[in-house]
Amino acid sequence: MPGKPLVSAIIIFWNEEQFIEEAIESVFAQTYGHWELLLVEDGSSDGSSEIARRYTEQYPDKVRYLEHRGHENRGMSASRNLGVRSARGRYISYLDGDDVWLPTKLEEQVAIMESNPTADMVLAPLLMWFSWTGNCQNRHLDQPYGVGRNGKHPYTDTLVEPPRLLALFLRYEQYIPSGFLAKRDVMEQIGEYEEQFRDAYSDAVALVKVCLKSPVYVSSKRWYRYRKHTASNTYLSRLHGKEDEEQQIYLNWVAAYFNQQKVQDPELLKIINKMLFRCRHPRLRSLERNLFYTTEKAFHYVKRIFWFLINLQRQKSLHTQQGKK
């Protein structure tokens, strides 16, 4: 496709036999056709490797299969690094083996990047996808992530200069999105993914590096469905009580990276110091969480009482008017 930039779509997977075919098909369903697909195997022991190899055999001009030496399991960061080193596209975008893209993702993200030549990356919220089960009772659980509590990102449909977006990410993790599209040379310039982060915070670390120095476009559209299930890394981390420990490791890395990069921005330094203080004092953090949830619960009760009284007053007014007639 002359004139259209090539996109390297990178799917990393580990034991995703149940879902990987749907992930791959979501790339083939893209309305933007100028892409290559790199399937990065991370040491699976189920049938997902065979599925990936089948696509490579059927579509050798579009799909490539990669794996670590000795079929080793090395984690998400090492697998993404393998994908980036093998990519040929002007742009790079990632998809986990259990998630899916919506059909217009690449077309619309490439259009945004081409219309904003100074942007190094485009970010967007995602859908926390519970309804993939087909159970209608799960439909109401689907919700956007990466937009904040009011349902809107503070910088929506805006090209954000560094490091404003990073300050937001560090303060509020719910604004960390997924399914981004970035310039390949930018991903190469920031250095590789940090392989100490095998699972949790793998993407967040890369975003810290990009958002510290690069202009980033924040879109309001959702192109990425993040499948929620009991075998996901997020669920297992919470189940085994590792969330706080993993966050502290991440924040310590951010502080060390700021020191390495000689960051002088007072807002960023204030935020990271505050976040580290909270992380190192779990009792204070627990108290803060409980206070937040108690306040939020009380607010909902007050809101319900308020609307009950409003409706009661309306009914009284209606009865009064009917009585006068």
Provide a role label for each language-model segment.
Residues 104-149:
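Conserved donor NDP-sugar-binding/catalytic core segment of glycosyltransferases
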Residues 25-69:
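Acidic donor-binding segment of Leloir-type glycosyltransferases
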Residues 92:
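Short aromatic/hydrophobic "clamp" motif used to bind/position activated sugar donors
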Residues 96-100, 125:
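The conserved acidic donor/metal-binding loop of glycosyltransferases
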Residues 1, 266-325:
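Membrane-interface aromatic/basic loop that binds lipid-linked glycans or pyrophosphate carriers
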Residues 1-28:
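N-proximal low-complexity "stem/linker" segments adjacent to membrane-targeting elements
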Residues 69-87, 108:
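Glycine-rich, basic loop-to-helix element that forms the pyrophosphate-binding segment
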Residues 85, 124, 146-240, 247:
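Conserved nucleotide-sugar donor-binding catalytic segment
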